[in-house]
A protein has these predicted regions:
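Extracellular/periplasmic juxtamembrane helices and adjacent flexible linkers that interface
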Residues: 250-331
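Bacterial N-terminal signal peptides that target proteins for export
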Residues: 1-9
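Periplasmic-binding protein-like
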Residues: 112-116, 178-183, 190-191, 223-256, ...
Length: 331
């Protein structure tokens, strides 16, 4: 009898061990304000992957400022995939040999399943009367924004402000002066998008927050509806959300197929609808049309149109000694 019990217990242990080994774990290292979006994506992906392969999977998430995340992956954080909000952060990983050199060719739309844009969140009732970029340089207006050296949110905010001047017919010199005035109204630079939102809503810093369109849903969910008003400026920038497989990790863990399937899933109608529900603009025209009520028409320009590429913008504006360092004085 005792031997039977021992055999039964041993069998349970073997079964548990087999189940644990059968379940693959995928780590998605992502940007700061994508937590809720990827939480919903992961909840949908697990049953999708089970139905597709018959295998169980657990998806883990890591979120912080996109540039800080890229550096962490370069330094050894074992991400299976990276889902960022600027191409420069993935280019950085490609240069380090962590991501494939041709990463943009491995998935549709230059490996960007979704996009966003930059807009303004203001206090309920818009007490400072913020309507467009020009209002952000008025005396007495405090602007909360992410440090462009630590997060893609901050880089896009900076480039959107610069591009606004250029789209109105201004020169680069005029854009420099405008953006310099804007950053003089910034009391403190946030490290990441969620840090900026926390500063604005929990610490009550500033009159206006420049952030991704997707933060509207996050703010409503976390802090309650109608805590902020949304202001769409006359011009803003297309912010791509690129993705890539981390070749170094998947080669070591044997998760290449899982990682590719996960990123492929982001292009499915189901995932594209999840994006739209989070105010993230889907690459699918059909889904974008279906959720047209969520995305107010706005005049958008691309990075390529005004800056050549994000890599070029990085060199000119955000590298040490670049335009940002020249116009911003640490307070």
């Amino acid at each position: 009898m005792n031997s039977n019990i021992k055999l039964f217990a041993f069998g349970l242990l073997v079964s548990a061990a087999s189940l644990a080994s059968a379940q693959q774990v995928l780590l998605n290292v992502s940007y700061d304000v994508a937590r809720e979006f990827y939480k919903d994506i992961d909840a949908a992906f697990v049953p999708y992957y089970k139905a597709k392969t018959g295998k169980d999977v657990k998806v883990e998430q890591s979120h912080a400022g996109s540039s800080a995340q890229a550096r962490a992956v370069a330094d050894g954080l074992d991400a299976d995939v990276v889902t960022m909000n600027t191409t420069t952060d993935i280019e950085f990983l490609a240069e380090k040999g962590v991501v494939a050199k041709d990463w943009q060719k491995r998935f549709p739309h230059n490996a960007a399943p979704t996009t966003s844009t930059m807009l303004f969140l203001v206090r309920e009732g818009n007490p400072k009367g913020i309507k467009d970029w020009d209002d952000l340089i008025r005396p007495g207006v405090q602007v909360v924004v992410v440090n462009p050296k630590t997060g893609g949110n901050g880089r896009y905010a900076y480039l959107a402000a610069w591009g606004y001047v250029r789209k109105k017919g201004g020169t680069d010199a005029q854009a420099f002066d405008f953006v310099q005035k804007l950053y003089k109204n910034v009391p403190v630079l946030a490290r990441g998008g969620r840090d900026a939102t926390t500063a604005f809503l929990q610490r009550n810093i500033g009159d206006v927050l420049i952030t991704f369109e997707s933060e509207v849903e996050s703010v409503n969910r976390e802090f309650g509806a109608n805590k902020v008003d949304v202001v769409y400026p006359s011009f803003s920038i297309v912010a791509e959300n690129p993705v890539a497989v981390v070749e170094r990790t998947v080669a070591k863990k044997g998760t290449a197929d899982l990682a590719k399937t996960y990123l492929d899933f982001l292009y499915t109608p189901e995932a594209q609808e999840i994006a739209a529900k989070h105010y993230i603009r889907p690459s699918s025209d059909a889904v974008l049309k279906k959720y047209a009520d969520k995305f107010k028409p706005i005049k958008l320009f691309t990075v390529e149109e005004l800056f050549g590429s994000l890599s070029q913008a990085q060199k000119v504006h955000f590298n040490d000694g670049g335009q940002f360092d020249k116009l911003y004085t640490v307070k």
